C-alpha cells in the first residue's frame, strides 16, 4: 500500500483512539497518515472572527483538533509522515472523497451508553457502506493501539463478489493470527 491511511477526527476521545490505531497501522504498513477534520458549524452559526487571531472561530477549533490529533499520532511514531486538512463540509462527504485515494479510512464512534455502543453513528454507517476502500470503525473506550497478538476477531461485511474490504480484512486477520468473521446482511 502506498496510499495514505485517512483518519477522521472530531475532537472526541473516540476519534483520538482512532488516531492511535491509524498511526500504528500507517507505521506498520509504511504509509503516510492523513488526518481530516470536517466541520459544518459555519452553516448554522455564521462566521465569527476569533479576535486575536483574525480567523473564523471554527478554523481555530479545527486547527486545535488537528494539532492534538497530530501530536497523538506522533507520540508513538515520531517519524510518521502526517498531513492534515480541515474542510468546511459534511463529514461523510469529506471522508467518502478522501476514500478515493486512501488505503483505508479509520474513524471512531461516539456512543453515549450501552445501547448506543452497539450502534454505528450515521457518519460511520454512511462511510462504511459507500466508501471505495476498506473502512475501520474503532469502537469501545479501551486502548485501541494496534499491536500484534491483541486482536481476537476481525469482522467484515461481505457482498456477492470479493471486495477490497474482504481482501483487506483477510490480510489483516492473517497478519495478526486473528479470527475472521464474514457477515452478510
Features from the language model and the residues they span:
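Structural beta-alpha unit
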Residues: 1, 14, 71-105
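Small/aliphatic-rich secondary-structure junction motif
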Residues: 1-52, 151-185
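A short acidic, glycine-rich active-site loop
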Residues: 53-64
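Glycine-rich, Arg-bearing micro-motifs that act as flexible, cationic patches
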Residues: 107-126, 130, 149-151
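Short beta-strand elements of ligand-binding domains
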Residues: 108-109, 135-140
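A short, basic/flexible loop-to-alpha-helix module at the beginning of a structural domain
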Residues: 141-150
